[in-house]
């Protein structure tokens, strides 16, 4: 979970990953770690210690307290406790594991103004995609099979109109991207993003409209 979260945040969203915790310890680099390079290094050496241009910490949990924007505990439960919670310097905690923040730590972090994206919401992505897979199995037709060529033909007509209006031909690479119809992966990602966005908005709305609810975790449970 942690690998894929870091990989997509870096490669698709331009995030700078400064710290990674593994079983043998943790590595830190303020200039940023290339997630795939770290993954391949660990695969080859069996550890992250010694990864180039990084600082290694034998006690990996110590870097939980390092300043960052988003902290993603993604492996074990109970890693953020009442003991280390007061020392955390992040703005957001995204719970990608089950129960990584204890009850006492949760209270402390809320008082500190640190936003917690709860596991009950954040871990729903896998279940959502499993639901999509179930729908696909019921129909025995892969997503995009019925409309991909139609979408490509529509895109081609749009490009022809644009080129006609501009009086010049579009760059071939830009044209290829515009012409490409939706494939199964794109459609699944689109459906997942829509589901997660809508769900998060419902959680926020629940928190804002119910005066008894003061945090996202309680709002998620209330839904």
Describe these PLM feature segments.
Residues 1-65:
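Glycine-rich phosphate/diphosphate-binding loop of Rossmann-like nucleotide-binding domains
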Residues 2-6, 79-82, 101-103, 124-126:
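Short glycine/serine/threonine-rich phosphate/pyrophosphate-binding segments
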Residues 13-16, 66-68, 89-90, 111-113:
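Short coil/turn connectors at secondary-structure junctions
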Residues 50-68, 119, 186, 190, ...:
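Alpha-helix-centered segments that form part of catalytic cores
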Residues 58-67, 76-93:
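Rossmann-fold NAD(P) dinucleotide-binding segment
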Residues 72-74, 96:
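Short, well-ordered coil/turn residues at beta-beta hairpins
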Residues 91-222:
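Adenosine-phosphate binding glycine-rich loop
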């Amino acid at each position: 979970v942690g690998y894929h979260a870091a990989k997509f945040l870096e490669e698709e969203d331009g995030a700078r990953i400064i710290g990674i915790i593994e079983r043998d310890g943790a590595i830190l680099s303020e200039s940023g770690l290339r997630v795939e390079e770290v993954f391949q290094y660990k695969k080859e050496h069996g550890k992250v210690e010694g990864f180039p241009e990084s600082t290694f910490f034998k006690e990996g949990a110590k870097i939980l307290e390092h300043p960052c924007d988003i902290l993603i505990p993604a492996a074990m439960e109970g890693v953020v406790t009442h003991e280390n919670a007061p020392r955390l310097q992040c703005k957001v905690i995204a719970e990608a594991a089950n129960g990584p923040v204890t009850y006492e730590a949760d209270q402390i972090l809320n008082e500190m103004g640190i936003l917690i994206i709860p596991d009950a919401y954040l871990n729903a992505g896998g279940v959502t995609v499993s639901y999509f897979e179930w729908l696909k199995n019921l129909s025995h037709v892969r997503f995009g099979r019925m409309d991909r060529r139609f979408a490509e033909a529509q895109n081609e007509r749009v490009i022809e109109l644009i080129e006609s209006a501009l009086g010049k031909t579009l760059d071939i690479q830009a044209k290829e991207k515009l012409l490409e119809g939706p494939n199964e992966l794109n459609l699944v990602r689109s459906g997942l993003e829509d589901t997660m966005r809508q769900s998060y908005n419902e959680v926020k709305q629940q928190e804002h409209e119910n005066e008894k609810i003061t945090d996202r975790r309680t709002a998620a449970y209330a839904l």
